[in-house]
């Protein structure tokens, strides 16, 4: 990690490593397996990516926790589709602002760095109807919330509400 050539961005004036798709998983999953070294660029990047995720959620008026997840599109067999979602400005991938999908497991990962904020966000997700029989549902897709509001459909009339993806992916249940 310490010898890889990586591009940097600035979050709140702090140097932060860019990831490919700016998912919280990309930043925080290594902390499950590798020792953390405080006051290093890696540690700072994880913390600043989390802060940017929280800020982006506030800007968009949704819970935070954007990562790889199933989203509100199904194939002909009714299987939810899956891809990486990220926060604009943290990733190299283009089009990060085009979608807005929040995955509760990303918040659970963030509890390693900020348990108070993570607990607050999990309560918010629970209040939005993301709790199911086996834990939290896979995600909530806000991508079309604003467009649906313009079309006048009641279920998304409030842009703070998205479409809950009522699925459980084993690797996101912890």
Where are these regions (language model features)?
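Ser/Thr/Asn(+Pro)-rich, low-complexity disordered segments
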Residues: 1-174
């Amino acid at each position: 990690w310490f010898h890889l050539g990586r591009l940097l961005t600035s979050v709140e004036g702090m140097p932060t490593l860019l990831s490919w798709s700016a998912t919280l998983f990309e930043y925080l999953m290594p902390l499950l397996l590798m020792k953390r070294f405080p006051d290093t660029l890696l540690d700072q990047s994880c913390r600043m990516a989390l802060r940017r995720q929280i800020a982006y959620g506030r800007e968009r008026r949704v819970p935070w926790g954007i990562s790889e997840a199933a989203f509100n599109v199904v194939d002909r067999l009714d299987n939810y589709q899956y891809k990486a979602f990220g926060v604009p400005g943290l990733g190299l991938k283009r089009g990060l602002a085009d979608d807005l999908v929040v995955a509760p497991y990303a918040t659970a990962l963030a509890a390693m760095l900020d348990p108070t904020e993570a607990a607050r966000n999990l309560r918010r997700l629970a209040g939005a109807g993301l709790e199911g029989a086996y834990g939290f549902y896979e995600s909530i897709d806000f991508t079309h919330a604003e467009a649906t509001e313009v079309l006048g459909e009641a279920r998304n009339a409030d842009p703070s509400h998205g479409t809950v993806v009522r699925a459980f992916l084993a690797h996101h249940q912890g």
